[in-house]
Amino acid sequence: MSANGRSILLVDDDQEIRELLETYLSRAGFQVRSVSRGADFRQALCEEEASLAILDVMLPDEDGFSLCRWIRSHQRLACMPIIMLTASSDEADRVIGLELGADDYLGKPFSPRELLARIKALLRRAQFTQVRGGDVLAFEDWRLDTVSHRLFHEDGEEFFLSGADFALLKLFLDHPQQILDRDTIANATRGREVLPLERIVDMAVSRLRQRLRDTGKAPRLIQTVRGSGYLLAAQVRPHLQP
């Protein structure tokens, strides 16, 4: 399985789901490899990259949250889109997954057709950011590398942004000093949501503010425009390498 934009690695301890998705996604033109344990998932990604990961939350040896965290902590894997699956109806599970950097979340039972649509949407978004990338954008005390998804502060701190966090910051940088409503933010950062739109957008903005050290009662960089949405109150410019 090669990371050619059409390869998927799935981990789920339900054999019927694995077989169903292997068949369905293969017919849609994807190369699919599936495993039943977290340890096997880690080994598979160490051996060969994938274009997208599908993680079941509940596994025999560990949970999908730890796998999501592990992916986002590795430079080689940090930008890979992640979809999480869960049989739980607990909203807290979904919030945790998204906060850890998952790009989308789907509850069981689910429609393979809907999963396929979400996979295609995430891969299109990943490809789009790669095509448009190449520049380093500077704003305030920060620089964003739009290819590697790395965010740098002038004090030397740097870290990787998950797909959702990167998409949100890139949206603000593409529209500086413009009010963006919640619909615009939701549509740009991920497709259909498993949580109420207002909740998911506010949570995503809050997470990005923490990354940018823009916390407190009156955030200065990403400002809330009451009744309208959010605004990036900063000048954005290309960063010229010395």
UniProtKB/Swiss-Prot annotation:
Disruption phenotype: Disruption of the gene causes loss of glucose transport activity. Inactivation results in elevated ingestion and reduced cytotoxicity of eukaryotic cells during P.aeruginosa infection.
Gene3D superfamilies: 3.40.50.2300, 6.10.250.690, Winged helix-like DNA-binding domain superfamily/Winged helix DNA-binding domain
Activity control note: Phosphorylation of GltR induces its dissociation from DNA leading to transcriptional activation.
4-aspartylphosphate PTM positions: D56
Keywords: Cytoplasm, DNA-binding, Phosphoprotein, Repressor, Transcription, Transcription regulation, Two-component regulatory system
Main localization of the protein described in the UniProt heading: cytoplasm
A biological process term (GO) from this entry: positive regulation of D-glucose transmembrane transport
GO molecular function terms listed in the Swiss-Prot or TrEMBL record: phosphorelay response regulator activity; transcription cis-regulatory region binding
Subcellular location: Cytoplasm
DNA-binding region: 134-234
GO cellular component assignments: cytosol; protein-DNA complex
Organism: Pseudomonas aeruginosa (strain ATCC 15692 / DSM 22644 / CIP 104116 / JCM 14847 / LMG 12228 / 1C / PRS 101 / PAO1)
Gene: gltR
Domain of life (superkingdom): Bacteria
Protein name (record): Transcriptional regulatory protein GltR
Cited function: Member of the two-component regulatory system GtrS/GltR involved in the regulation of glucose metabolism and transport, as well as regulation of the exotoxin A gene expression. GltR controls the transcription of genes involved in glucose metabolism (glk and edd/gap-1) and transport (oprB) as well as the expression of toxA that encodes exotoxin A, the primary virulence factor. Acts as a repressor that is released from its target operators upon phosphorylation. Contributes to modulation of the type III secretion system (T3SS) in response to host cells via the regulation of the OprB transport system.
Domain Response regulatory: 7-123
Record PTM: Phosphorylated by GtrS.
